[in-house]
Amino acid sequence: SGPGSRSGCGAGRTVSRYTLGIDTSNYATSLAVFDTAGEVVCAKKRFLPVKAGQLGLRQSDSLFHHTVALPEMMQELAQEFDLTQIDAVGVSQKPRPVEGSYMPCFLAGVNAATAFAHAKGIPLVLTTHQQGHAAAALFAAKGEQLFAEKVLLFHISGGTTDLLLCDQVRRITTLGTSTDLYAGQAVDRVGVRLGFGFPAGAEVSRLAA
Protein backbone atom coordinates (compact mmCIF):
# COMPACT_ATOMS: atom_id res chain seq x y z
CA SER A 1 0.00 0.00 0.00
CA GLY A 2 1.23 3.52 -0.80
CA PRO A 3 0.80 6.95 0.81
CA GLY A 4 -2.82 7.85 1.49
CA SER A 5 -4.02 4.25 1.22
CA ARG A 6 -3.95 3.38 4.91
CA SER A 7 -7.13 2.57 6.76
CA GLY A 8 -8.16 4.72 9.73
CA CYS A 9 -8.95 8.38 10.21
CA GLY A 10 -6.82 9.50 7.27
CA ALA A 11 -8.35 7.12 4.73
CA GLY A 12 -10.40 8.41 1.83
CA ARG A 13 -9.26 12.04 2.14
CA THR A 14 -8.67 13.96 -1.08
CA VAL A 15 -7.16 17.11 0.47
CA SER A 16 -3.45 17.01 -0.25
CA ARG A 17 -2.07 19.40 2.38
CA TYR A 18 -2.03 18.64 6.10
CA THR A 19 -0.61 20.24 9.23
CA LEU A 20 0.52 18.44 12.38
CA GLY A 21 -0.20 20.24 15.65
CA ILE A 22 1.62 19.40 18.89
CA ASP A 23 0.86 20.68 22.39
CA THR A 24 2.55 19.55 25.61
CA SER A 25 0.80 21.51 28.33
CA ASN A 26 0.80 21.00 32.08
CA TYR A 27 -2.16 18.64 31.76
CA ALA A 28 -1.96 16.58 28.58
CA THR A 29 0.09 15.50 25.58
CA SER A 30 -1.85 16.31 22.41
CA LEU A 31 -1.31 15.60 18.70
CA ALA A 32 -3.65 16.47 15.85
CA VAL A 33 -3.60 16.47 12.05
CA PHE A 34 -5.60 19.21 10.30
CA ASP A 35 -6.51 19.65 6.65
CA THR A 36 -6.53 22.96 4.75
CA ALA A 37 -10.13 23.62 5.82
CA GLY A 38 -9.10 23.49 9.47
CA GLU A 39 -10.91 20.21 10.07
CA VAL A 40 -9.39 17.66 12.45
CA VAL A 41 -8.43 14.59 10.42
CA CYS A 42 -6.86 12.60 13.23
CA ALA A 43 -6.05 13.33 16.88
CA LYS A 44 -4.44 11.74 19.92
CA LYS A 45 -4.56 13.00 23.50
CA ARG A 46 -3.12 11.56 26.69
CA PHE A 47 -3.55 13.12 30.12
CA LEU A 48 -0.47 13.18 32.32
CA PRO A 49 -0.59 10.71 35.24
CA VAL A 50 -1.35 12.49 38.51
CA LYS A 51 -1.57 10.57 41.79
CA ALA A 52 -4.97 10.49 43.49
CA GLY A 53 -5.52 13.54 45.65
CA GLN A 54 -2.74 15.55 44.02
CA LEU A 55 -3.30 18.87 42.25
CA GLY A 56 -0.93 18.49 39.33
CA LEU A 57 2.71 17.62 38.69
CA ARG A 58 6.10 19.22 39.12
CA GLN A 59 7.42 20.63 35.85
CA SER A 60 10.27 18.10 35.78
CA ASP A 61 7.74 15.26 36.03
CA SER A 62 5.52 16.80 33.35
CA LEU A 63 8.48 17.12 30.99
CA PHE A 64 9.45 13.50 31.64
CA HIS A 65 5.95 12.15 30.95
CA HIS A 66 5.62 14.20 27.75
CA THR A 67 9.00 12.92 26.55
CA VAL A 68 7.91 9.33 27.14
CA ALA A 69 4.45 9.79 25.61
CA LEU A 70 5.34 11.61 22.39
CA PRO A 71 7.13 8.75 20.54
CA GLU A 72 4.37 6.31 21.51
CA MET A 73 1.62 8.68 20.41
CA MET A 74 3.39 9.52 17.15
CA GLN A 75 3.53 5.81 16.40
CA GLU A 76 -0.19 5.49 17.16
CA LEU A 77 -0.90 8.45 14.88
CA ALA A 78 1.22 6.92 12.11
CA GLN A 79 -0.87 3.76 12.26
CA GLU A 80 -3.98 5.78 11.40
CA PHE A 81 -2.60 8.51 9.13
CA ASP A 82 0.19 8.64 6.56
CA LEU A 83 2.58 11.14 8.16
CA THR A 84 4.49 11.56 4.89
CA GLN A 85 1.57 13.79 3.83
CA ILE A 86 2.32 16.36 6.54
CA ASP A 87 3.34 19.70 4.97
CA ALA A 88 3.84 21.83 8.11
CA VAL A 89 4.14 21.50 11.88
CA GLY A 90 2.73 23.82 14.51
CA VAL A 91 3.66 23.60 18.19
CA SER A 92 2.96 25.45 21.43
CA GLN A 93 6.28 26.80 22.70
CA LYS A 94 5.00 28.49 25.88
CA PRO A 95 1.76 29.17 27.80
CA ARG A 96 0.97 32.72 26.59
CA PRO A 97 2.26 35.11 23.88
CA VAL A 98 3.86 37.50 26.37
CA GLU A 99 7.43 38.13 27.43
CA GLY A 100 8.50 35.93 30.33
CA SER A 101 5.85 33.26 29.76
CA TYR A 102 7.61 29.93 30.24
CA MET A 103 7.05 26.34 31.33
CA PRO A 104 9.62 23.54 30.79
CA CYS A 105 6.89 21.06 29.79
CA PHE A 106 6.52 22.80 26.42
CA LEU A 107 10.11 21.93 25.53
CA ALA A 108 9.08 18.32 24.88
CA GLY A 109 6.67 19.37 22.15
CA VAL A 110 9.06 21.93 20.66
CA ASN A 111 11.85 19.35 20.44
CA ALA A 112 9.59 16.76 18.79
CA ALA A 113 8.13 19.29 16.34
CA THR A 114 11.54 20.72 15.45
CA ALA A 115 13.01 17.27 14.78
CA PHE A 116 10.00 16.27 12.65
CA ALA A 117 10.03 19.50 10.63
CA HIS A 118 13.78 19.44 9.99
CA ALA A 119 13.74 15.75 9.04
CA LYS A 120 11.03 16.41 6.43
CA GLY A 121 12.23 19.86 5.38
CA ILE A 122 8.85 21.47 6.08
CA PRO A 123 7.86 24.73 7.84
CA LEU A 124 7.77 24.89 11.64
CA VAL A 125 5.27 27.33 13.19
CA LEU A 126 5.82 28.31 16.82
CA THR A 127 2.70 29.39 18.69
CA THR A 128 1.41 29.33 22.27
CA HIS A 129 -1.03 27.32 24.34
CA GLN A 130 -3.31 30.33 24.77
CA GLN A 131 -3.38 31.05 21.03
CA GLY A 132 -4.36 27.43 20.48
CA HIS A 133 -7.32 27.85 22.83
CA ALA A 134 -8.28 31.09 21.08
CA ALA A 135 -8.10 29.54 17.61
CA ALA A 136 -10.19 26.55 18.70
CA ALA A 137 -12.85 28.84 20.17
CA LEU A 138 -13.07 30.94 17.00
CA PHE A 139 -13.31 27.88 14.78
CA ALA A 140 -16.07 26.49 17.00
CA ALA A 141 -17.99 29.78 16.86
CA LYS A 142 -17.93 30.84 13.19
CA GLY A 143 -15.00 29.16 11.54
CA GLU A 144 -12.45 31.22 9.64
CA GLN A 145 -14.65 34.34 9.45
CA LEU A 146 -13.65 35.51 12.95
CA PHE A 147 -9.94 35.17 12.19
CA ALA A 148 -10.15 38.32 10.07
CA GLU A 149 -11.73 40.36 12.88
CA LYS A 150 -10.87 41.72 16.30
CA VAL A 151 -12.80 39.83 18.95
CA LEU A 152 -13.11 39.83 22.74
CA LEU A 153 -12.45 36.43 24.24
CA PHE A 154 -12.59 35.02 27.76
CA HIS A 155 -9.89 32.39 28.31
CA ILE A 156 -10.85 30.40 31.40
CA SER A 157 -8.58 27.46 32.18
CA GLY A 158 -6.37 25.95 34.87
CA GLY A 159 -3.76 28.66 34.45
CA THR A 160 -5.73 31.67 33.23
CA THR A 161 -8.88 33.68 33.78
CA ASP A 162 -8.25 36.35 31.16
CA LEU A 163 -10.23 38.82 29.08
CA LEU A 164 -8.40 39.02 25.76
CA LEU A 165 -8.54 41.20 22.66
CA CYS A 166 -7.64 38.89 19.78
CA ASP A 167 -6.56 40.34 16.45
CA GLN A 168 -6.49 37.41 14.01
CA VAL A 169 -5.18 35.28 16.94
CA ARG A 170 -1.62 36.28 16.01
CA ARG A 171 -1.84 39.35 18.25
CA ILE A 172 -3.43 38.94 21.67
CA THR A 173 -3.73 41.75 24.22
CA THR A 174 -4.68 40.96 27.81
CA LEU A 175 -7.34 43.44 28.96
CA GLY A 176 -7.98 41.87 32.35
CA THR A 177 -6.92 38.91 34.45
CA SER A 178 -7.61 37.29 37.81
CA THR A 179 -5.51 38.45 40.75
CA ASP A 180 -6.62 35.48 42.82
CA LEU A 181 -7.33 31.81 42.13
CA TYR A 182 -7.87 30.99 38.46
CA ALA A 183 -11.29 29.57 37.55
CA GLY A 184 -9.83 26.28 36.34
CA GLN A 185 -7.85 25.88 39.54
CA ALA A 186 -11.02 26.32 41.58
CA VAL A 187 -12.82 23.66 39.53
CA ASP A 188 -9.91 21.24 39.86
CA ARG A 189 -9.66 21.74 43.62
CA VAL A 190 -13.38 21.10 44.05
CA GLY A 191 -13.17 18.04 41.81
CA VAL A 192 -10.20 16.53 43.63
CA ARG A 193 -11.96 17.11 46.97
CA LEU A 194 -14.92 15.18 45.54
CA GLY A 195 -12.62 12.27 44.72
CA PHE A 196 -12.14 12.88 41.00
CA GLY A 197 -8.78 12.63 39.26
CA PHE A 198 -6.80 15.67 38.14
CA PRO A 199 -7.66 17.57 36.01
CA ALA A 200 -11.27 17.33 37.16
CA GLY A 201 -13.06 19.71 34.79
CA ALA A 202 -14.82 17.04 32.73
CA GLU A 203 -16.03 15.14 35.80
CA VAL A 204 -17.26 18.29 37.56
CA SER A 205 -19.11 19.33 34.38
CA ARG A 206 -20.83 15.95 34.17
CA LEU A 207 -21.79 16.18 37.85
CA ALA A 208 -23.20 19.68 37.38
CA ALA A 209 -25.17 18.82 34.22
Protein language model features and the residues they cover:
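Conserved phosphate-binding catalytic cores of ATP/NTP-utilizing and phosphoryl-transfer enzymes
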Residues: 16-17, 122, 126-151
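A short helix-loop
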Residues: 17, 24-25, 42-43, 147, ...
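Short beta-strand segments
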Residues: 23, 90-92, 128, 152-157, ...
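Short glycine-rich, Thr/Ser-proximal phosphate-binding strand/loop in the N-terminal lobe
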Residues: 25-64, 172-174
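Short beta-strand scaffold segments in enzyme catalytic cores
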Residues: 29-35, 135, 153-155, 161-165
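Short, well-ordered amphipathic alpha-helical segments that serve as non-catalytic structural scaffolds
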Residues: 44-46, 65-81
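Short beta-strand-loop/turn "lid" adjacent to the catalytic site in phosphate-handling enzymes
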Residues: 75-114
